[in-house]
From Swiss-Prot:
InterPro entries the record matches: Ribosomal_bL27, Ribosomal_bL27_CS
Gene that this polypeptide is encoded by: rpmA
Record keyword Magnesium present: no
UniProt-recorded name of the protein: Large ribosomal subunit protein bL27
GO cellular component, one term: cytosolic large ribosomal subunit
Keywords: Ribonucleoprotein, Ribosomal protein
PTM remark: The N-terminus is cleaved by ribosomal processing cysteine protease Prp.
Lineage, broadest ranks: Bacteria, Bacillati, Bacillota, Bacilli, Bacillales
Propeptide segment residues: 1-9
Annotated family: Belongs to the bacterial ribosomal protein bL27 family.
Biological process per Gene Ontology, one example term: translation
Domain of life assignment: Bacteria
GO MF annotation terms: structural constituent of ribosome
Amino acid sequence: MLKLNLQFFASKKGVSSTKNGRDSESKRLGAKRADGQYVTGGSILYRQRGTKIYPGENVGRGGDDTLFAKIDGVVRFERKGRDKKQVSVYAVAE
């Protein structure tokens, strides 16, 4: 009687899944205008979550805490007390 020893090997490699490979889209937060820069009314000055920087003179705060210029003028980033910062817009004399 003839005995055959047949062994079959996997023709496909075992594929494992990974739990990585995804990331959230960046929110593009931070300063949009620099200190001393001229801006027009309605320009976004600073995008933020919460009040990292407070609105100063002639600056409004949007529903998502975005700071924007209310008038045309020059941007100034200033200190507000010991530990707070604010951004203001001052009109330019022409």
